[in-house]
Amino acid sequence: MAALKLLSSGLRLCASARGSGATWYKGCVCSFSTSAHRHTKFYTDPVEAVKDIPDGATVLVGGFGLCGIPENLIDALLKTGVKGLTAVSNNAGVDNFGLGLLLRSKQIKRMVSSYVGENAEFERQYLSGELEVELTPQGTLAERIRAGGAGVPAFYTPTGYGTLVQEGGSPIKYNKDGSVAIASKPREVREFNGQHFILEEAITGDFALVKAWKADRAGNVIFRKSARNFNLPMCKAAETTVVEVEEIVDIGAFAPEDIHIPQIYVHRLIKGEKYEKRIERLSIRKEGDGEAKSAKPGDDVRERIIKRAALEFEDGMYANLGIGIPLLASNFISPNITVHLQSENGVLGLGPYPRQHEADADLINAGKETVTILPGASFFSSDESFAMIRGGHVDLTMLGAMQVSKYGDLANWMIPGKMVKGMGGAMDLVSSAKTKVVVTMEHSAKGNAHKIMEKCTLPLTGKQCVNRIITEKAVFDVDKKKGLTLIELWEGLTVDDVQKSTGCDFAVSPKLMPMQQIAN
C-alpha cells in the first residue's frame, strides 16, 4: 500500500509539472523504488575491489576452462594472500593460469566443481588429501547457482539419480593413506510421473568474481560469445558481485534489449588492466585441408567406429557430442543433411575448427577447443544450456565410456583413488529420457579387459541411460529390461568372437547385418 501511495504521489507531481508548462524530461524525472537506491561502485585497482574478501569466504568464480575467467581479479587475490577459500567454479583453469594459480599458492581449501580435467596440480592435491573437492554435475552446478540467485532454496533434478551423487559416499577429501576422510552425503529422492529425481540445494557466495566484455557507467553488462558460460548466473548469486570488463562505455551505448546483466546485480566494477586471454586448446583447420580425417591417420579401429557413429545423425537433429570419437564423427555428417551441434558451455550451431586467423579465445567448445559457428548460431549461459539438455530438447548425445552394463548403466568419470577427471556435463546429458544416448568406444580395455559388462564396477555416470553401443566389432541396441541385442557385426567376425570379448550375454537380432559405414 505504501508503494502504491508513493506511485500515486509521484504521478500527481509529474502531472503538475507537465501542466505548469515544464518540459517533461527536464521538469520531471520520476524514479520509484520500494528498496534502498544502490549504485554500482567503480574501481581502478583490482586489489582494492577484492581486499575485503576474508579468509574462509565462499567465492564464485566465472569462466569455462580459461574462457571468460576474471584474470585481473584472480591475480588480485594472489596479492591479498587471502586463505581458506571455498571456490565455486566449473573447473580450476590449468596449473599455471586461472584458478590454478590460487591452488598452487594453497589459498583454496575446497573446490566445488564439475571437472578436474587436465589440471595436474588440482588432481594431485585432491588425491593426496591436501584439497577438498565437491564434484558436482555441471548442469546441477549451474542450476544450483541460478537457484541461489533467484531465491529458490532447493530443487529436484533427474541428474545423478542412481550414482554416487544420489547415494552419497563420493570422496570430498582423502586421508594421506588414501582412505576417505570426508564423503558426500546422500540426496533425498522423490518420484514424479514415474521418474526419479534428487533434491539439490542452491549455492550462494559471499563474493562473485565475474568476467564480462563491456559495461556502461550505470553498471549494465554484456558478454562476448561463449565467454558468457557460468559468469551470467554467478552475477546474481552472491552478496557482493565484482565484475571486470575489457571496456566501459557511456550510458545509452547499449540498447536496453541487448543488456545481458542489469545493473541491479553488479556491485563493483573494474576495467581490467591487461588480458592474456590464453587459449587452452588451439585447434586449427589448416589451409588446403580436404576431406575430414580421423585424429590418427591409419587408425582403422577408431575410423571404423567414427564412420558408423556418423550414421546416427538425422536431418534437423540437435546433437551434443563428447570429445574424441563423437566429435570426430561430426566430420562425416552427410552434406545432404543439417545437424545442429550444441555445446554445454553455451553454444548452439557449432561449426568446424577455425583457420589460424579466425581463432578466438572467447569462442570454444566443451572440450576447450577453438571453434567457429555457423549462420543461425546462438550463445547463452551455462544454466540455459543445461535447461536445453535436462529438458530433453537435445535429440542425441554421443559420448565415450569406460564401462557400460547389460542394461545400459554408464560409467565414464572416475576410477576411485587413481584417476579423477570429474563428470563434467555427462550426468546431465544422459538424464533425460527424451534424448537418445549413444556410446562410442573400443570394445575392450587394455589387456582385453571387458568394457561391456553384466554390471559396472566403476562409479556410475547414469543408470539405465544408454540406448546404443557402437564399437569396432559390433553395434548393440540396449533395452532397460531385456538387455543387449546385437544388431550389426563387423565383416570377418562371428557372433562367437564378439561374445568372447563381451562380459555379459546378449541376444542376436534376426535381422543381424554387417556393420554399416558412412561413405567418404
From Swiss-Prot:
Family matches, as SMART domains: CoA_trans
Broad EC category: transferase
EC nos: 2.8.3.5
Location in or out of the cell: Mitochondrion
Transit peptide (first-last residue): 1-39
Result of altering residue 437 to M: In SCOTD; uncertain significance
Gene Ontology cellular component terms for the protein in this record: mitochondrial matrix; mitochondrion
Membrane-spanning parts: none
Effect of residue 270 to K: In SCOTD; uncertain significance
GO biological process: adipose tissue development; heart development; ketone body catabolic process; ketone body metabolic process; ketone catabolic process; positive regulation of insulin secretion involved in cellular response to glucose stimulus; response to activity; response to ethanol
Any matching Pfam family: CoA_trans
Keyword list, A-Z: Disease variant, Lipid metabolism, Mitochondrion, Phosphoprotein, Transferase, Transit peptide
Domain of life: Eukaryota
Catalyzed chemical reaction(s): a 3-oxo acid + succinyl-CoA = a 3-oxoacyl-CoA + succinate; acetoacetate + succinyl-CoA = acetoacetyl-CoA + succinate
Sites of N6-succinyllysine modification: 185, 418, 421, 455
Effect of residue 226 to N: In SCOTD; loss of activity
S-S bonds: none
Active site residues per record: 344 (5-glutamyl coenzyme a thioester intermediate)
Keyword Lipid metabolism set for record: yes
Residues recorded with modification Phosphoserine: 170
Protein's job: Key enzyme for ketone body catabolism. Catalyzes the first, rate-limiting step of ketone body utilization in extrahepatic tissues, by transferring coenzyme A (CoA) from a donor thiolester species (succinyl-CoA) to an acceptor carboxylate (acetoacetate), and produces acetoacetyl-CoA. Acetoacetyl-CoA is further metabolized by acetoacetyl-CoA thiolase into two acetyl-CoA molecules which enter the citric acid cycle for energy production.
Family: Belongs to the 3-oxoacid CoA-transferase family.
Subunit (UniProt): Homodimer. Only one subunit is competent to transfer the CoA moiety to the acceptor carboxylate (3-oxo acid).
Medical condition linked: Succinyl-CoA:3-oxoacid CoA transferase deficiency: A disorder of ketone body metabolism, characterized by episodic ketoacidosis. Patients are usually asymptomatic between episodes.
Protein's name in the database: Succinyl-CoA:3-ketoacid coenzyme A transferase 1, mitochondrial
Taxonomy of the source species: Eukaryota, Metazoa, Chordata, Craniata, Vertebrata
Gene for this chain: OXCT1
